[in-house]
UniProtKB/Swiss-Prot annotation:
Residues 1-24, 965-1101, 1164-1210, 1232-1256 are annotated as: Disordered. Residues 1077-1095 have a biased composition (Pro residues). Keywords: Actin-binding, ATP-binding, Cytoplasm, Cytoskeleton, Hydrolase, Motor protein, Myosin, Nucleotide-binding, Phosphoprotein, Repeat, SH3 domain. This is Myosin-1. The lineage of its organism: Eukaryota, Fungi, Dikarya, Ascomycota, Saccharomycotina. GO terms for molecular function: actin filament binding; Arp2/3 complex binding; ATP binding; hydrolase activity; microfilament motor activity. Residues 1-12 have a biased composition (Basic residues). Residues 1054-1065, 1188-1205 have a biased composition (Low complexity). Phosphorylation of the TEDS site (Ser-360) is required for the polarization of the actin cytoskeleton. Phosphorylation probably activates the myosin-I ATPase activity. Residues 407-490 are annotated as: Actin-binding. The keyword Cell cycle does not apply. The modification Phosphoserine is found at residue 360. Belongs to the TRAFAC class myosin-kinesin ATPase superfamily. Myosin family. Residues 1012-1028 have a biased composition (Polar residues).
Length: 1256
C-alpha cells in the first residue's frame, strides 16, 4: 500500500507532556517460572569459543531446555524423548508474543514468521538444517502445527478444511517417505518443501503446495542391517485391513524379503498399527477416493511380492524363476500377462541399427545377478512413480480457488550423511545440504557484510568459510566440469555397460579434482571435504544409479496393464515415448537433483528466511546422553561461533527508508496525524523524525544510503509495541474526552437536581437530624458540635457504600452484603476476668437488619478485620443513654447470649446512631437517665452512673470512665436546637477534577461531617461559622486575629473546599499622595501628648491553646502534622487524640494529645487589641506574613493626626514616609514569600489534595 500524503494542519497546537501513567499493575511472583540455566541467547556469552558454546548447550540440554538462540537463529538439540513442550497451553503462550517475551522455542520462530507475513507483507520461509537424526522433521511438523492453529478462524469451514489437509500431509508423507535408519527412527528419505499460501485480506491459509526432492528409492529393495524399509510396508503388513488381506494376499512383514532382510521389523517407540490408522485417516482428509486407496495398496502389495521373486540357474546357467506362482500373483496384482512378466525379468531385448535402417532384435537371457537387478529395478520404479503421484495428488487437493502472492515455506529435507559405504544417494543428499549451507552463508554472513559495505555502515569484517567451492566441485559444468558432469559424460561414453561407465568415471576424477583442495582421488574411491566433514564415496555402481531410467522392457510390460492407474497414471504413454526416442538424451538423476536444488535456492532467495540449526547429541538415540566431541564437531561445521561473532557485531533488523516510514510513521506527530501521512520531506528525514520522537538512542541504529539498520531486536520490538498500541491510545484519548464531557454534564445535572429537590422537599439529611434531635430533646445535654447549623446525618461516614476505599475494604473483609445505612468509629467497653473494664477502638456498621461491631487486628504484620459481634436490630429491647453530653450508648437485647451480648459503646455520632436504629425498628425503646443499665453477662445487670464535673481530671471534650462511673463536663442545655444552615459561598466550577488523573484518594478518619464521596451536594461543617442558639461560655471572637509566626512551613495544604482568605478582602495600604509643601508655620509650644488609651481586659481565646512538644509527621489519614514549639487550638479531645486547629483556623485534623502541652495563648493572638504606636523603620526588615503586615499598616494609618504636635510636623512626615516605604517593602517581600510558599506547597502536595479533607 502506497503512503497517502496529507497536508499538515495549519493550527499550531502546543504539545504537552502526558501525565504519568497511574494504572501500573501489581508485580506478582511467578511460581511456575523455572530457573534459567546457561544463557538463552549465545550472543550473551562472555567468551565466544566453540567450547563455551558447547558447554552452554550441554547445561541446557541436561536441564531439559533444548532450544537456544543466536540472535534470530534457533539452535535445537534433539532430546530423543517427549518433553511435553508442544501442547495447547504452550502454543497459546507463544501466540502474539515476540521472541524476547518468551523462552526460546520453535513456536517463537513460527510466530515470528506469521507476524512478519501479516505486518510486512513478505514471503517467509524456514530453513531447517542438521545431520540425520538431529530433529529436522519434528521441527517442521511443529511449525506446521503452530501456523495452522494460529492462522485459522474456527468459524470458517473452508479454511479449517485447508488446515486439516495441511496437517494430514505429515502422517501420509512420513509413512511413504520416512524410514528407520541407524541414526534416526524417523529419518526423511526424501526432501519436501511445503508452501502454505495465505489470503491477503485476513491472512488465513487458502492453499498449499508440496515440492518433492529425490526419494531414496534404493531403500525399497535393500537396507543395511538394523535399518528398515519405508514405514508404509510395515504398517500395511502388520495391520492390513481384512479386505486387503484377502484381495492382495498380505501376510506379516517377516514373509517378505524387502521387509525382513535387514533383520529389523520392530522398533521401540514406533506403533505401526496406530500409524496405519493415522495414514488412512490422512488419506480421507486429503480426499483420496476409495478406488485411489485400493490402487495405492495394490502397488504396495505388488512391490512386496516382486521382492519374493527368486531365481535358479537352468541348464545353460541362465536365470529361471524358482516359483512360478509368485510371478503369477504379481501379474495378477499388476494386471499383466504372466508370461510377459517372466520374460521381462529373465530376458533383455536388444535392438541393433544400421545407420538409419532398423536392425535385428535379440532376446538375451540374463544370469541370476542380472535378473535380480531387473526385478529390483521394477520394484523401485513402481514405488518411485507411486510416491511422486501421491505428492501430485495431495497438491491437487491443497490447491485453492484463488491465487495468493504471499506464502510461508517449510523445508524438511534429509540431513547430512556419512556412512561406512557411501554411494550416489549420499553424494546427492550431501550436495543438497551443501546448497542449503551456501544459502545460509549468503543470507546471513556474506550478504550481511556485503550490505554493510554497500550502505556505508561502520563495520569490522569477520572471516568465515564460504562453501561455494565445494558446491562448484559437484555441480559445475565449466570451466572445470564437476562430479555430476563427469558422471553424465561417463554414461554417454559407455552407456551399454555399467562397469565400463564406472571405469570411465574413475578416470575422469583425476581431472575433476586436480586443482581443488577439497577433493582427493583414491583408487576406486574419492573423498570430498564437505563443510560437515570428510566423506569417502565408492565409484562402483554410481553411473548405473545416475541413469535413473527403467529398462524399456519393463516400461513396455507395464504399459500392457489392464489397470488404468498403472498404464495411464504411473506409467503414461509419454514415458515410453521418451525412452524409445533415441535422439534425446534422457534426464539423469544428477540432472534432476541439480535442477531441483537450484530451483529450491531460487525459491528460498525470494523469501525472508528464518533458520533452525538442529544438533544430534549422541549416536545411540538415548535421552539425557550428550557426547561432547560429537556435538563439538557439529558446532564447528555449522559455523555457530562465526554466526555468534557476526551477530554481536551486526544489526538485528534492516529495511529501506520507505518501508520503515510506511510501517512506523504513526509514531511521530510530525509524520502522522489521525492515521494519515503528513510529512513533506524525504524518507530519510522522516526516519530521523520517527526515531527522535520514539527516543531511540543514536547508538541503537545507523542510517545507510538506502536503509535504516536497527542494532538490537529489543528496539524493533519496542517500535512494534508502540505501533500496536497507537490506535488503542487514540481510541482511549477520544473516550476520555467524551467521558469528561458527559461527566461534566452529569455533574451539572446532579447539582441542579439536588438544589431543586432541597428547595422543593427540603434536605433529607437535615430532616433526619431534626427527627433524631427530637428523640432526645429536653432529655439530654448536647455537645456543641452537634448543634452546628451545617450538621447533617449523612450515615455512611466510612464510605462502605463506595466502590473503592477503606469502606469497601471493610465490607469485603467482613462479608457484609447488605446496604449500609450507618458506619463510623468508636469504642467498646470490654471486661476481662480479673481485670478492670477497658475501652477498645472498634468500627460500627449498621445495615437494615444487623449491627456489626468490627475489630482491627494485626496478623503477621498485616491489618485484618474481624467481625466481633453481630447484633440483630429486631432483637434489641432498648437503647440507653445518659442525660449528659457524653457519647455512651448501651444496647440491650431481649435474649442476650455469649455470642450476642449486651454492649456498652461510645461513639461521637451516638444520636445519629440511635436515630437510624429507631427508624429501622420503630418499636425500639430509648431510655435516658442518670444511670444506664445493661447485662454484662446474660442475667447479670450492670449499672453505670453518670455525673457532671469541672475538675481538671475531666477532659474538655471527652469523659472519664472509672469503676462504673462516667464523669463528663457540662454540655449545652437539652433544649438546644440547630440553627439554620449557613449560606454557602459562591465559587467557580473546578474543572481540574475532569482532567487530573492519578490523584491519590484519601480514607479519612471518623468525623462529624460526611466524606466527599457520601456528600456531594453539601458543604463541610468546617466551612461554616457555627453559632449555636445557647452557648453561655463562648467568648466573643476578635474582629481579626494575627496569625502566629511559624518556624516551619504549614504542615499540610489547605483543603480545596475549605474557605480560603480571599485576596480582595485584604488590600495593601495605598501610598499617600505627595501634597504641595505648606507655607512655613509660626513656631509655637508643642501641645501635650494625648493620654494613652484605656487598657482593655485581656481577650480569651475561643479554644484552649496547646504547644507542640514534639514534631509529628501527620502520616495517618485525617491527621494534621505538628511542628515543635508551635501553638495550636485543641477543639476537642477523644481518648488519646485531639482535634487540632492552627491559630488561623486554615487547617484542622487529629493529632496525639500526648504530643501537646496546654499553654497560655500567645500575645500575638490579640495583636488587634494592643494600643497603636508610631511605626519605626527597622534597621533590617523582618519577613512577616501578609495578614500581619496588612494589620500593622491598618493600625498605623488609623492614628489620628491630632496626636502629632505641630512643632514636629516635618519630622513626623519624614518618619511617616520612611515607615510607609519600609512597610511597602516588607509587604512586597511578604507577598513574594507567601506566593513562593503557596506554589511550593501546591507542587509538593498536588497529589494529596484529597488527603486533607479531614473530618471533625
Amino acid at each position: 500500500m502506497a503512503i497517502v500524503k496529507r497536508g499538515g494542519r495549519t493550527k499550531n497546537k502546543t504539545q504537552q507532556q502526558a501525565p504519568a501513567k497511574s494504572g501500573i499493575k501489581k508485580a506478582e511472583f511467578d511460581l511456575h517460572k523455572s530457573k534459567e540455566v546457561g544463557v538463552s541467547d549465545l550472543t550473551l556469552l562472555s567468551k565466544i569459543t566453540d567450547e563455551a558454546i558447547n558447554d552452554n548447550l550441554h547445561k541446557r540440554f541436561m536441564n531439559g531446555t533444548i532450544y537456544t538462540y543466536i540472535g534470530h537463529v534457533l539452535i535445537s538439540v534433539n532430546p530423543f524423548q517427549d518433553l511435553g513442550i508442544y501442547g495447547p497451553e504452550t502454543l497459546s503462550k507463544y501466540r502474539g508474543r515476540n521472541r524476547l517475551e518468551v523462552p526460546p522455542h520453535v513456536f517463537a520462530i513460527a510466530e515470528s514468521m506469521y507476524y512478519n507475513l501479516k505486518s510486512y507483507n513478505e514471503n517467509q520461509c524456514v530453513i531447517i538444517s542438521g545431520e540425520s537424526g538431529a530433529g529436522k522433521t519434528e521441527a517442521a511438523k511443529q511449525i506446521m502445527q503452530y501456523i495452522a492453529n494460529v492462522s485459522v478462524d474456527s468459524g470458517n469451514a473452508e479454511i479449517s478444511k485447508i488446515k486439516d489437509m495441511v496437517l494430514a500431509t505429515n502422517p501420509l508423507l512420513e509413512s511413504f517417505g520416512c524410514a528407520k535408519t541407524l541414526r534416526n527412527n524417523n529419518s526423511s528419505r526424501h526432501g519436501k518443501y511445503l508452501e502454505i499460501q495465505f489470503s491477503e485480506s485476513n491472512h488465513q491459509p487458502i492453499a498449499a503446495h508440496i515440492t518433492n526432492y529425490l526419494l531414496e528409492k534404493q531403500r525399497v529393495v535393500s537396507q543395511i542391517t538394523n535399518e528398515r524399509n519405508f514405514h508404509i510396508f510395515y504398517q500395511f503388513t502388520k495391520h492390513c485391513p481384512t479386505q486387503y488381506q484377502q484381495q492382495f494376499g498380505i501376510q506379516g512383514p517377516e514373509t517378505y524379503v524387502y521387509t525382513s532382510s535387514a533383520k529389523c521389523i520392530n522398533v521401540d517407540g514406533i506403533d505401526d498399527s496406530k500409524d496405519l490408522d493415522e495414514t488412512l485417516s490422512a488419506m480421507k482428509i486429503i480426499g483420496l477416493t476409495e478406488l485411489e486407496q485400493n490402487n495405492i495398496f495394490r502397488m504396495i502389495a505388488s512391490i512386496l511380492w516382486i521382492g519374493n521373486v527368486s531365481f535358479v540357474e537352468d541348464e545353460s546357467g541362465n536365470a529361471a524363476i524358482r516359483d512360478d506362482s509368485v510371478t503369477q500373483f504379481v501379474a495378477y496384482l499388476l494386471e499383466v500377462n504372466p508370461e510377459i512378466l517372466k520374460k521381462a525379468i529373465v530376458e533383455r531385448v536388444i535392438e541393433t541399427t544400421h545407420g538409419m535402417r532398423r536392425g535385428s532384435t535379440y532376446h538375451v537371457p540374463l544370469n541370476i545377478v542380472q535378473a535380480t537387478s531387473v526385478r529390483d529395478a521394477l520394484a523401485k520404479g513402481i514405488y518411485n512413480n507411486l510416491f511422486e503421484w501421491i505428492v501430485e495428488r495431495v497438491n491437487v487437493s491443497l490447491k485453492g480457488a484463488s491465487q495468493s502472492s504471499k506464502t510461508i515455506g517449510i523445508l524438511d529435507i534429509y540431513g547430512f550423511e556419512i556412512f561406512e559405504h557411501n554411494s550416489f544417494e549420499q553424494i546427492c543428499i550431501n550436495y543438497v545440504n551443501e546448497k542449503l549451507q551456501q544459502i545460509f552463508i549468503q543470507l546471513t554472513l556474506k550478504a550481511e557484510q556485503d550490505e554493510y559495505v554497500k550502505e556505508q555502515i561502520k563495520w569490522t569484517p569477520i572471516d568465515y568459510f564460504n562453501n561455494k567451492v565445494v558446491c562448484d566441485l559437484i555441480e559445475a559444468t565449466r570451466p572445470q566440469p564437476g562430479l555430476f558432469a563427469a558422471l553424465n559424460d561417463s554414461i554417454k561414453t559407455a552407456h551399454a555397460d555399467s562397469d565400463a561407465a564406472d571405469q570411465v568415471f574413475a578416470q575422469r576424477l583425476s581431472m575433476v579434482g586436480a586443482s581443488n583442495r577439497h577433493f582427493e582421488d583414491r583408487k576406486g574411491k574419492f573423498i570430498i571435504k564437505h563443510y560437515a566433514g570428510d566423506v569417502t564415496y565408492e565409484v562402483a555402481g554410481m553411473t548405473d544409479k545416475n541413469k535413473d531410467a527403467l529398462l524399456r522392457d519393463l516400461v513396455e510390460l507395464l504399459s500392457t496393464s489392464a489397470n488404468p492407474f498403472v498404464n495411464q497414471v504411473l506409467f503414461p504413454p509419454s514415458l515410453l515415448a521418451s525412452i524409445t526416442d533415441s535422439k534425446k538424451r534422457p534426464e539423469t538423476a544428477s540432472d534432476k537433483i541439480k535442477r531441483s536444488a537450484n530451483d529450491l535456492v531460487g525459491t528460498l532467495s525470494k523469501c525472508q528466511p528464518s533458520y533452525i540449526r538442529t544438533i544430534k547429541p549422541n549416536q545411540t538415540k538415548r535421552p539425557k546422553e550428550y557426547e561432547n566431541q560429537q556435538v563439538l564437531h557439529q558446532i564447528k561445521y555449522l559455523g555457530l561461533k562465526e554466526n555468534v561473532r557476526i551477530r554481536r557485531a551486526g544489526f538485528a533488523f534492516r529495511t529501506t527508508f520507505e518501508k520503515f516510514v510506511q510501517r512506523f510513521y504513526l509514531l511521530s506527530p510530525a509524520t502522522g496525524y489521525a492515521g494519515d501521512y503528513i510529512w513533506r520531506g524525504d524518507d530519510i528525514s522522516a526516519v530521523k523524525e520517527i526515531l527522535k520522537s520514539c527516543f531511540i538512542p543514536a547508538t541503537e541504529y545507523q542510517l545507510g544510503t538506502t536503509k535504516v539498520f536497527i542494532k538490537t531486536p529489543e528496539t524493533l520490538f519496542g517500535l512494534e509495541d508502540m505501533r500496536d498500541k497507537y490506535w488503542h491510545n487514540m481510541a482511549a484519548r477520544i473516550q476520555r474526552a467524551w467521558r469528561r464531557y458527559v461527566k461534566r454534564k452529569e455533574d451539572a445535572a446532579r447539582t441542579i437536581q439536588s438544589a431543586w429537590r432541597i428547595k422543593k422537599h427540603g434536605n433529607q439529611f437535615e430532616q433526619l437530624r431534626d427527627y433524631g434531635n427530637g428523640l432526645v430533646q429536653g432529655r439530654k445535654e448536647r455537645r456543641r458540635m452537634s448543634m452546628l447549623g451545617s450538621r447533617a446525618f449523612m450515615g455512611d461516614y466510612l464510605g462502605c457504600s463506595d466502590t473503592s476505599g477503606y469502606g469497601r475494604f471493610i465490607v469485603t473483609q467482613t462479608g457484609i452484603n447488605e446496604k449500609v445505612v450507618f458506619s463510623g468509629r468508636g469504642e467498646i467497653l470490654l471486661s476481662k476476668f480479673g481485670r478492670s473494664s477497658k475501652r477498645l477502638p472498634r468500627i460500627f456498621v449498621v445495615t437494615r437488619t444487623t449491627i456489626f461491631i468490627i475489630a482491627e487486628v494485626l496478623i503477621e504484620k498485616r491489618l485484618q478485620l474481624q467481625s466481633e459481634f453481630k447484633i440483630p436490630i429486631s432483637g434489641l429491647n432498648y437503647v440507653a443513654l445518659s442525660h449528659l453530653q457524653d457519647n455512651w450508648v448501651a444496647l440491650s437485647l431481649h435474649s442476650p447470649t455469649p455470642s450476642t451480648p449486651d454492649v456498652f459503646i461510645s461513639l461521637d455520632f451516638k444520636t445519629e446512631f440511635v436515630t437510624h436504629l429507631k427508624k429501622i425498628n420503630p418499636g425500639l425503646t430509648i431510655n435516658i437517665g442518670t444511670t444506664v443499665q445493661y447485662q454484662k453477662k446474660p442475667g447479670k445487670f450492670h449499672t453505670v452512673k453518670f455525673i457532671s464535673g469541672n475538675s481538671s481530671d475531666v477532659p474538655e471534650y471527652g469523659d472519664v470512665y472509672k469503676s462504673g462511673t462516667v464523669t463528663v463536663k457540662p454540655g449545652l442545655p437539652s433544649s438546644s436546637r440547630n440553627p439554620k444552615r449557613p449560606r454557602g459561598k459562591s465559587g467557580k466550577v473546578d474543572y481540574s477534577k475532569y482532567y487530573n488523573r492519578g490523584v491519590k484518594k484519601s480514607f479519612p478518619v471518623p468525623s462529624a461531617r460526611p466524606t466527599a464521596a457520601s456528600q456531594p451536594s453539601y458543604k463541610s461543617p468546617v466551612e461554616q461559622s457555627y453559632q449555636p442558639q445557647v452557648l453561655a461560655y463562648q467568648t466573643p471572637r476578635p474582629e481579626e486575629a494575627k496569625p502566629v509566626q511559624r518556624k516551619a512551613p504549614p504542615p499540610a495544604p489547605v483543603v480545596q473546599n475549605q474557605p480560603q482568605r480571599q485576596p480582595q478582602a485584604i488590600e495593601p495600604v495605598r501610598p499617600v499622595k505627595k501634597t504641595a509643601p505648606s507655607p512655613p508655620v509660626r513656631k509655637t509650644a508643642p501641645p501635650p501628648p494625648p493620654p494613652p488609651p484605656a487598657l482593655s481586659a485581656p481577650a480569651k481565646p475561643k479554644f484552649p491553646t496547646y504547644k507542640a512538644m514534639y514534631d509529628y509527621d501527620g502520616s495517618v489519614a485525617g491527621s494534621i502534622p505538628l511542628v515543635k514549639d508551635v501553638v495550636y487550638y485543641v477543639e476537642s479531645i477523644n481518648g488519646k487524640w485531639g482535634l487540632v486547629k492552627t491559630l488561623d483556623e486554615s487547617k484542622e485534623g487529629w493529632s496525639p494529645i500526648d504530643y501537646l502541652s496546654q499553654c497560655e495563648p500567645p500575645s500575638s493572638l490579640f495583636g488587634a487589641a494592643n494600643p497603636p504606636s508610631r511605626p519605626v523603620a527597622p534597621s533590617q526588615p523582618k519577613v512577616q506574613s501578609r495578614e500581619s503586615t496588612v494589620a500593622s499598616a491598618a493600625v498605623s494609618s488609623s492614628t489620628p493626626a491630632s496626636t502629632v504636635s505641630n512643632g514636629s510636623l516635618s519630622n513626623g512626615l519624614a518618619e511617616a514616609l520612611r515607615a510607609k516605604k519600609t512597610e511597602e517593602t516588607t509587604l512586597a517581600g511578604s507577598l513574594a514569600d507567601a506566593l513562593k510558599k503557596r506554589q511550593g506547597a501546591t507542587r509538593d502536595d498536588s497529589d494529596d489534595e484529597d488527603d486533607d479533607d479531614d473530618d471533625w
